[in-house]
Design a protein with these regions (language model features):
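Helical scaffold of the NTase/Pol beta-like nucleotidyltransferase catalytic core
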Residues: 1-33
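Conserved nucleotidyltransferase catalytic core and NTase-mimicking acidic/glycine-rich helix/loop elements
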Residues: 14, 114, 121, 125-245
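Catalytic metal-binding acidic patch
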Residues: 33-69, 81-87
């Protein structure tokens, strides 16, 4: 959605980068977007980067070579390396990355050019297939991550905290797949998922508190979180596996 209000501090941080892009290379640009947490209440300027998508008329590797040295300067200012795409790439990749494109469609702010994502069509069959695959991948990752932590509380806690953000795009996609409008903020995503599926997501709320440095759980508590995490993803996987079959 391009009608989202852009906070002044976000605009102030991103505009110098945008000016560099447009000053000499505007003719290469189809459109530029800010995406992700910078558009939500979850954004924390102390730890969050500003993510963006740059759509070029055609992929230009020389342009990327010119832009690369600027990464250090703007990276220190909290500007993450953008995703670069072309209209043709977007059109040809919707079936491969429906979750990613759905999340961009749901949460973007156009800062330059014509909004190519607003009316982007995401096929529900493609979305269901990727949701099912991603849930299975999450289960593999949970098993491997838990064992590789080797009983180290700090490693396990860090692993859970670092993994949290990767679940939110998937959960938003599941909410949309099940026919509902997805919220944009993490606590609302979790509560909506519970309301729709009946699957409790308390473990993810606990990890969100851990991620926000509000708790310091014991190893016993982390073991319970692991079990609950696994059960949630397993139940969601079974639900999506049976969806529309």
């Amino acid at each position: 959605m391009s009608g989202l209000n852009l906070k002044a501090d976000i605009a102030d941080r991103y505009n110098p980068f945008l000016e560099v892009l447009l000053e000499e290379h505007q003719n290469k640009m189809h459109s530029v977007y800010i995406v992700g947490s910078a558009l939500t209440r979850d954004y924390d300027p102390k730890i969050s980067d500003i993510n963006s998508v740059i759509v070029l008329h055609e992929m230009d590797l020389k342009f990327l070579e010119m832009l690369a040295p600027l990464g250090r300067k703007f990276g220190k200012q909290g500007i993450a390396a953008p995703l670069f795409m072309t209209p043709a790439y977007i059109d040809n990749s919707r079936d491969v990355f429906p979750i990613e494109f759905l999340n961009i469609k749901l949460l973007h702010h156009t800062v330059f050019g014509q909004d190519i994502f607003r009316d982007l069509d995401i096929d529900r069959a493609d979305l269901r297939h990727q949701c099912e695959r991603e849930l299975k991948v999450k289960l593999i990752g949970l098993r491997q991550g838990y064992v590789s932590a080797a009983g180290d509380r700090k490693i396990l806690a860090t692993g859970f905290a670092d993994s949290f953000a990767g679940y939110m795009p998937l959960f938003k996609a599941i909410i949309v797949l099940l026919g509902h409008e997805s919220p944009q903020n993490n606590p609302d995503i979790l509560s909506t998922l519970t309301d729709i599926t009946g699957i409790r997501t308390d473990a993810f709320n606990q990890v969100l508190a851990l991620k926000n440095r509000q708790t310091k759980p014991t190893m016993e508590k982390l073991n319970l979180v692991f079990e609950d995490y696994y059960e949630i993803i397993e139940q969601l996987g079974e639900m999506i596996n049976a969806f529309d079959k």
